[in-house]
Amino acid sequence: MKIAIYPGSFDPVTNGHIDIIQRGRHLFDKIIVSILLNPGKKALFSLDERLDMLTESLKDIDGVEVDSFAGLLIDYAERKNAKAILRGMRAVSDFEYEFQMALMNRRLNRDIQTVFLMTGMRWIYTSSSIIKEAATFGGDISGMVPAIVEKKLEEKIGYVVNHKKAED
């Protein structure tokens, strides 16, 4: 079985993340979507909230497991018998960091490959940080996040749309 790990903070999960997962399923038998516990990052949502949002958002996609981990990604991938790390790239600006991480992971374990998928054009500008900022100021984020995320943002920060949606 070809298993890939798709790591991230998913604070919150976006439709761009889901696009990468759906396309990754064409390449792998199983994708483990795993939240990295990073004490250096201040998350808006708790680990449990992020796990719940991911589980709800991915419930209709077969071959996907939701999990979390702390420590080195490559060690986690070994424990899960994964042969690949799946990463999405939005723009050239993502490349340098992702390339360095891929090289380090390859140095630590040559048997685990990093596979990059370019984000679909529809999601190229989307990131969890931008979503949170837009929601904070009442920007319309519908269609950019799963319904459960929109609901949780409303509960967490009082997200209410106060701007008209622009045409795509």
From Swiss-Prot:
Its cofactor is Mg(2+). GO terms for biological process: coenzyme A biosynthetic process. It is an enzyme of class 2 (transferase). GO terms for cellular component: cytoplasm. Pathway: Cofactor biosynthesis; coenzyme A biosynthesis; CoA from (R)-pantothenate: step 4/5. One of its GO terms (molecular function) is pantetheine-phosphate adenylyltransferase activity. It catalyses: (R)-4'-phosphopantetheine + ATP + H(+) = 3'-dephospho-CoA + diphosphate. Its EC number is 2.7.7.3. The keyword Zinc does not apply. Its main location: cytoplasm. The record marks H17 as: Transition state stabilizer. Reversibly transfers an adenylyl group from ATP to 4'-phosphopantetheine, yielding dephospho-CoA (dPCoA) and pyrophosphate. This is Phosphopantetheine adenylyltransferase. It comes from Desulfosudis oleivorans (strain DSM 6200 / JCM 39069 / Hxd3). The lineage of its organism: Bacteria, Pseudomonadati, Thermodesulfobacteriota, Desulfobacteria, Desulfobacterales.
